[in-house]
UniProtKB/Swiss-Prot annotation:
Similarity field: Belongs to the PTPS family.
Record PTM Phosphothreonine, positions in chain: T161
InterPro entries the UniProt entry points to: 6-PTP_synth/QueD (IPR007115), 6-PTP_synth/QueD_sf (IPR038418), PTPS_Cys_AS (IPR022470), PTPS_His_AS (IPR022469)
Modified sites of kind Phosphoserine: S159, S164, S165, S167
Keyword Magnesium listed: no
Chemical reaction(s) catalysed: 7,8-dihydroneopterin 3'-triphosphate = 6-pyruvoyl-5,6,7,8-tetrahydropterin + triphosphate + H(+)
Cofactor: Zn(2+)
Official protein name in the record: 6-pyruvoyl tetrahydrobiopterin synthase
EC number(s) on file: 4.2.3.12
Length: 168
């Protein structure tokens, strides 16, 4: 029996949003020191490009990892309806007490895209291009005792040992 082929499927979307990099856990002076001009009281905006990638076996019946329509609808719900042309700090509850860094934006998108997918374990990566030079990639929570494998498996640090577990 041959091994089932695995493929990556990526959908790209662009949205615009504004924010102010500011942490309620820091003083105003500390915020200015950490975030510099991005801590401007009036905020600033970005034209973000987001790439959502799923990874999984190619279904023998459909020839697909995931129907691209399902991914498109998840992106529409999570990104376009909730984030596009919004002030992240004021319009998105998640950022009320969480700094709206691109790293945290990637976590927000990851968590919410997973809720939209029939098979959330297929979500492999959220990549956000904040600018042409600043890009954040997020592949989900990192387990402390192993390297993260997005098909709900852990791979031991010892490259000679491969440990799989579906119960994580």
């Amino acid at each position: 029996m041959s091994q089932q082929p695995v493929a990556f499927l990526t959908r790209r979307e662009t949205f615009s949003a504004c924010h102010r990099l500011h942490s309620p856990q820091l003083s105003d002076a500390e915020n200015l020191e950490v975030f510099g001009k991005c801590n401007n009281f009036h905020g600033h905006g970005h034209n973000y490009t987001v790439e959502i990638t799923v990874r999984g076996p190619i279904d023998r019946r459909t020839g697909m990892v995931l129907n691209i329509t399902e991914l498109k609808e998840a992106i529409e719900t999570v990104i376009m309806k909730r984030l596009d042309h919004k002030n992240l700090d004021k319009d998105v509850e998640y950022f009320a007490n969480t700094p709206s860094t691109t790293e945290n934006l990637a976590v927000y998108i990851w968590d919410n895209i997973r809720l939209q997918l029939k098979k959330p374990e297929l979500l492999y990566e959220v990549k956000i291009h904040e600018t042409p030079k600043n890009i954040i990639s997020y592949r989900g929570p990192y387990p402390l005792n192993g390297i993260y494998n997005p098909i709900n498996k852990r791979i031991a640090h010892d490259s000679c040992t491969n440990i799989s577990s579906d119960s994580d």
